[in-house]
Amino acid sequence: MLKTSETNSENKKDQTIAGHHSSELLHYLLHRRSVPRKNLIEPGPTEPELKQILEAASRVSDHGKMVPFWFTVITENNKDEFEQILINAMKTDDDKTGDDKLEKKAGKLMSAPLIVSMISSPRRESIPAWEQFMCVGAACQNLVLAANALGYGVNWLTEWYSYDENVRQAMHLEDHENIAGFFFIGTAGEVPEDRDRPEVEELTTFWSPDSSLVKKGQKYIEKKDKKDKGR
C-alpha cells in the first residue's frame, strides 16, 4: 500500500510519498542518457515546467535542512550578456584569437534553449561540508531527472568557465561558493547511443567481518585507471 502523509501549505493540500511502485520510473532510470549540448534544440521548458524542475531539484535528502545550494537561470533574454562575459573571460587567457572566433565559440557554449547553473553554497554550520556537497550533488541529479521526466534532454557540465574568476564574479559568488554545474536543457534533436557502463557486480560488496574481503569498487576503479592509461 502506498504510504503518504498529508501536509498543508498556504492554499493547497499535498501528499508526500515514501514509496511508490513504478516500473516506468525504474525503466527510465536504467536507460537515461545525457544529450550532447550541440544536440539540444528548441523548444525548451516553459516557465511552469522550469518551476517544476527547480522544485524537484530542491527536494532532496538534506542533513540539517541546510539547503546548501541555489540556482541561476540563463534565458534567451539575458543569454547575449552572458555570452559576452564568456568572451571577455576567454580574451583574458587568449589574446591572440580574433573576436569573431571567440564569439562563435561562446555562442556554441550558450546554444541550448535553457541554461541553469547550480551554485554550491555550504553553510557555516555544524553539518560537515562534505555532507552538504553530497546534498548539492543530489540536487543536481534531481534537476537532470526532472527535466528528463518532462521530455527534455539535458547535459550537466562544469568545464573551464565554472572555475573562471571572471565568470564567478559575474555570477555574484562568495568565496565559499562554487558552480556545481551548468545544466543545458532542450529538446533532444538526436539521442546518442549508450556509453560503457560498469557491471554493478564489479561495484558491489556484501559486507563480511572477514578482513580479506575484496573491495570490488576499488578493484573496478584500478582496472579502469589501467585501461585509461593504456589508451
Placement of each model-derived feature along the sequence:
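N-terminal amphipathic, basic helical "cap/leader" segment at the start of enzyme domains
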Residues: 1-111, 217-231
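Conserved hydrophobic/aromatic beta-strand scaffold that supports enzyme active sites
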Residues: 28, 115-117, 182-184, 205-206
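Short, basic/glycine-rich phosphate-binding loops at helix/coil junctions
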Residues: 30-33, 113-123
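Short Asp/Glu-rich motifs
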Residues: 76, 166-167, 173-174
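A glycine-rich helix N-cap at a beta->alpha junction
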Residues: 106-108, 171-196
